[in-house]
Amino acid sequence: MSKTKDVKKVVLAYSGGLDTSIILKWLQTELGAEVVTFTADLGQGGELEPARKKAEMMGIKDIRIVDVREEFVADFVFPMFRANTVYEGTYLLGTSIARPLISKHLVDIARETGADAIAHGATGKGNDQVRFELSAYALNPDIKVIAPWRDWSFKSRTDLINFAEQHQIPVAKDKRGEAPFSVDANLLHSSSEGKVLEDPWSEPPEFVHQRTVSPMDAPDKVTEIEIEFLKGDPIALNGKKLSPATMLAALNDLGRDNGIGRLDLVENRFVGMKSRGVYETPGGAILIVAHRAIESITLDRGAAHLKDEFMPRYAELIYNGFWFSPERLMLQAMIDKSQEDVEGTVRLKLYKGNVMVTGRKSKKTLYSDALVTFEDDRGAYDQKDAAGFIRLNALRLRTLAARNRKG
């Protein structure tokens, strides 16, 4: 607590949920600090106005709700998708990629308002505390960060609910009148954790899924779409030009209706433990398939393979909170260079949780009908050349086999 005793004004990353509402009250009562709330409109939907009303009810005078949807998708989500980024083979990093943007705005507002510190609601067990703070320190090495979960005496959500009741802080309930799961949402994804999901053998109840219909309940008909790309980013859907945020929102709607993007996974947290979550990334699940498809005809083999080699490291940097690190920026420069000629159109069919590529075309294509045809290629490729190619590549293998045969 000693590092916070001189804090007079704090900028709080505020969602309006249980944790950050209690943190708001804690900052007021325990520190006697003036609190500025910052709520990022990341496309999470109906949480924004309730967050404003709750902050007003708790006496906050400076309430910042900032629409960052276009910035989020254009400057964070799309650069990540240029790399086909997946953490541990499955996770599209929907929570991870939002944290550096939130930290950026926290630092900016703290500078603007003359605040002594910023604060967040991430627990001491999770990744988000690392992501928020590494990003903040990368942008302002002298910033003071308050992380109440590491300082206060509360040990559980039950403790928080008891504190909320003592201070007349409204506690949200789910549709069944129970305390909700721990939920994070933005334009890219939604995640649900806690309660019954803490048992990795327990099947997630259907009501946990907030953004997608079950694949079993999706329509018994195919939805066909076309996505146009330029420099690795989607720019048009079914021939209509869309802004980055509008594009992702439209893909989300298509994914939602067709049961696409559900994921139940156990991941390795940066802090060392495993955690289980249920994630929904409907638009992102469509986008990554489409992006790989357009790369398949426009990206050189060597460049594509090198890019794939670096992708796990790039994904790990984002997951662990190093978005503003020099190594992430170095990799981003390489990735962006690779995307200069990644343009064209991909045709997809969406059906009951599946995303199927049915066509791809580009003015920058490297695909040659003349080279791959089973018919007469009119001299485009001399098959006799393959004999020397094989002979040279087999040289070391034959040498090794000859040695081993001698025994």
Curated annotation (Swiss-Prot):
Top EC class, one word: ligase
PROSITE patterns hit by this protein: ARGININOSUCCIN_SYN_1 (PS00564), ARGININOSUCCIN_SYN_2 (PS00565)
GO process terms (BP): argininosuccinate metabolic process; L-arginine biosynthetic process; urea cycle
Keyword rRNA-binding: no
GO CC field: cytoplasm
Chain positions recorded as L-aspartate binding sites: 123, 127-128
GO molecular function, one term: argininosuccinate synthase activity
Location of this chain's protein in the cell: Cytoplasm
Annotated TM spans: none
Residues where L-citrulline binds: 91, 96, 127, 131, 182, 191, 267, 279
EC number: 6.3.4.5
Record keywords, A-Z: Amino-acid biosynthesis, Arginine biosynthesis, ATP-binding, Cytoplasm, Ligase, Nucleotide-binding
Pathway note: Amino-acid biosynthesis; L-arginine biosynthesis; L-arginine from L-ornithine and carbamoyl phosphate: step 2/3
Short name of one Pfam family: Arginosuc_synth
Catalytic activity of the protein: L-citrulline + L-aspartate + ATP = 2-(N(omega)-L-arginino)succinate + AMP + diphosphate + H(+)
Keyword ATP-binding: yes
Positions annotated to bind ATP: 13-21, 40, 121
HAMAP family according to UniProt: Arg_succ_synth_type1 (MF_00005)
Family statement drawn from the similarity comment of this UniProt entry: Belongs to the argininosuccinate synthase family. Type 1 subfamily.
Subunit record text: Homotetramer.
Protein name, UniProt field: Argininosuccinate synthase
Source species: Mesorhizobium japonicum (strain LMG 29417 / CECT 9101 / MAFF 303099)
Gene that encodes it: argG
